[in-house]
Amino acid sequence: MASLLQDRLTTDQDLLLMQEGMPMRKVRSKSWKKLRYFRLQNDGMTVWHARQARGSAKPSFSISDVETIRNGHDSELLRSLTEELPLEQGFTVVFHGRRSNLDLVANSVEEAQIWMRGLHLLVDLVTSMDHQERLDQWLSDWFQRGDKNQDGKMSFQEVQRLLHLMNVEMDQEYAFSLFQAADTSQSGTLEGEEFVEFYKALTKRAEVQELFESFSADGQKLTLLEFSDFLREEQKERDCTSELALELIDRYEPSDSGKLRHVLSMDGFLSYLCSKDGDIFNPACLPIYQDMTQPLNHYFICSSHNTYLVGDQLCGQSSVEGYIRALKRGCRCVEVDVWDGPSGEPVVYHGHTLTSRILFKDVVATVAQYAFQTSDYPVILSLETHCSWEQQQTMARHLTEILGEQLLSTTLDGVLPTQLPSPEELRRKILVKGKKLTLEEDLEYEEEEVEPGLEGEHESELALESQFETESEPEPQEQNLQIKDKKKVVTCPLFCPSICCQIVAQAPISKPGSLLLSQQKSKTILCPALSSLVIYLKSVSFRSFTHSKKHYHFYEISSFSETKAKRLIKEAGNEFVQHNTWQLSRVYPSGLRTDSSNYNPQELWNAGCQMVAMNMQTAGLEMDICDGHFRQNGGCGYVLKPDFLRDNQSSFHPERPISPFKAQTLLIQVISGQQLPKLNKTKEGSIVDPLVKVQIFGVRLDTARQETNYVENNGFNPYWGQTLCFRVLVPELAMLRFVVMDYDWKSRNDFIGQYTLPWSCMQQGYRHIHLLSKDGISLCPASIFVYICIREGLEGDES
């Protein structure tokens, strides 16, 4: 069983030198720089490091976890150490998910180039592998781990230890019989290809064999006609033709003779079921398939909150890495909190906290570099400007000079249109969202009330929440950091018909016994140079839906805290839906989420809110929903809203959905699982007891969850065979989340893997669900095998 990488590992000069090992400095901070010896392992898939050249080594990283390699000039940390460490000798290993980057500095430019070229080559080889190649590589990795003495052979004792590592509990006599059957050389050990045969016997899938034989006349093969029947009857391929069946046979049948005879063997059938064509996610939804010519407000837009933070909201690190990660995962709206910095250079950080600071110009340069690497559709810079006049001018200069032609600085046709432009019209453009001077605005005097029902404990919570919220157009009751009695708050914005705009917010007057944390007047003077860069996305305060309809325009946008947005959905859900058919809304997390936790974005999407900003640095259920939602449509960051969320006469209310909606019933038979990993390393020696939980997220009436029983001591090939039933009123807004857990009767179940997708992207029939980690990284070959059936209308379980 030769690894797919063996040819390159034995012929490529860079990889040969990497296998010998080299000393490099591992850099974590300005004060932590340690010499370590790094070596590529013989499997070509892992890099180990040791403190000494001949010291005991431990794993550093796996090639499959690496996203890309950057040179030293692109590293914030290495750039800050140029006086000590030459940038030309440094490089950065960037990992998938949320794992911190690894900064390394070699002893010479040549050695740095060797590692950069070699790692690039290995990453390219891994990312180009298909499912079967990944499985072969996975087997090769396990063989390497099981072969303790590295003699290229595995004794039965080594196989037994390996089975335990692979989450397999098996009768010793049965395991030995499989071992003997695979040992064709009768040497008492298994070599490469013998181990493959042992694995095939171990993973023989009776449920797939039974399905195969139910459509095969002779039980040995599927003819073109039989396979066509299977695709049409079970897989619900509406446009199934003999041409489609033949194309799939050519793609997945491993034997040349089978391809010539137009038949599919059992191995080919299993290969099809495990492929992207057999995946639960419809391949037709993977590329850009939606109409991209509608106004921006007709789309859900992937959005990030406090993008510069890679940790918590109080003491976390600010880094351009936050922008890189957000943009590369398809995020199209990023937030930039800008404050006066030293030497006349604006800085970005979470104001009034201990978060670190980065230069505004570095953020802009990062956005310019990464904005369109994943998607060509427009990026929105949500500016929260707290700078002086002078530093606002500096901001405007950086935006103009660094972004150049990428920056949208005028309307597309030079005149004010009647609706927002489309993503297609704004391809590869960067838009600025922020405050804007309007000479025509009249002097207004407004009275705004603290939200009713927020007395006492809730009022105190709201006041504390406001301490950490920095939206450019905050809600009136959240403008001042205070704990106060319910009362009116008076503000008087002054719009001067000159070159600047001065907004004066009057601090509320405290009553006896109330605690004011800040009574200073807040003044913001807006610079025309910066104001002129805001074209289609002028930030305005939200007062009421009636006020917005009467006084605001389509090119204006309001921001809502999650607290207020959820309240509006409950109290005026249909008005919110109609508001979002003609104007953009941005929702941001509560200021109480100082740990950078997230809310469920689905609740806001239900009302048509376009920009639901997430703390993307924090993994969890909420980000699974967000990632799953934007996985469709090419991962471009824009998803077209359902028609009833685009119709300005819509009667839809997310809290009380009524007809006409095409309600559906979903039947899911959870059949089996394959190669489920044991992720909780603290439970050494235990084998997982897996169960599958299925969750529906959508309108409140559709939200539901069910789970299977657990299978004891089998993470390798558990079988459930259980059917779950869900009834969904508004499938257009529904998301499905499949979660595999390790049952524990003494404590909380441990997470193993998940997969989340939109209802509209789900394929019917026999499908594999390829699991992802908490960080959204593939756990290949871990999967669950299910049967999906969708029926029109609401049916009972007996159906």
Swiss-Prot record:
Residue intervals of the PI-PLC Y-box domain: 530-646
Q: Subunit notes for this chain?
A: Interacts with GRIP1. Interacts (via GBA motif) with guanine nucleotide-binding protein G(i) alpha subunit GNAI3 (inactive GDP-bound form); low-affinity interaction.
Q: What is its EC number?
A: 3.1.4.11
Report the principal subcellular site: membrane
Motif GBA: where in chain: 213-243
* Residues annotated for Ca(2+) 2 binding in this entry: D183, S185, S187, T189, E194
What reaction does this enzyme carry out catalytically?
Answer: a 1,2-diacyl-sn-glycero-3-phospho-(1D-myo-inositol-4,5-bisphosphate) + H2O = 1D-myo-inositol 1,4,5-trisphosphate + a 1,2-diacyl-sn-glycerol + H(+); a 1,2-diacyl-sn-glycero-3-phospho-(1D-myo-inositol) + H2O = 1D-myo-inositol 1-phosphate + a 1,2-diacyl-sn-glycerol + H(+)
Could you give the cofactor binding note from the entry?
Binds 5 Ca(2+) ions per subunit. Two of the Ca(2+) ions are bound to the C2 domain.
What's in the GO CC field? endoplasmic reticulum; nucleus; plasma membrane
- What's the short name of a Pfam family annotated to this entry? C2
Q: Where is each C2 domain found?
A: 646-773
Residues bound to Ca(2+) 5? D742, Y743, D744
What does the record say about domains?
The PDZ-binding motif mediates the interaction with GRIP1.
Superkingdom per UniProt? Eukaryota
EF-hand domain sequence ranges: 134-169, 170-205, 206-237
Q: Where is this motif: PDZ-binding?
A: 768-771
Gene encoding this chain?
A: PLCD4
State if ATP-binding is listed as a keyword: no
The identity of this protein, by name, is 1-phosphatidylinositol 4,5-bisphosphate phosphodiesterase delta-4
Enzyme's top EC category: hydrolase
| Annotated binding of Ca(2+) 3, by residue | N306, E335, D337, E384
Tell me the organism.
Answer: Macaca fascicularis
Which InterPro entries does the record cross-reference, listed alphabetically? Answer: C2_dom, C2_domain_sf, EF-hand-dom_pair, EF_Hand_1_Ca_BS, EF_hand_dom, PH-like_dom_sf, PH_domain, PI-PLC_fam
Q: Where is this region: Substrate binding?
A: 26-53
Which residues are recorded as modified (Phosphoserine)?
Answer: S460
GO MF terms, alphabetically ordered: calcium ion binding; G-protein alpha-subunit binding; phosphatidylinositol-4,5-bisphosphate phospholipase C activity
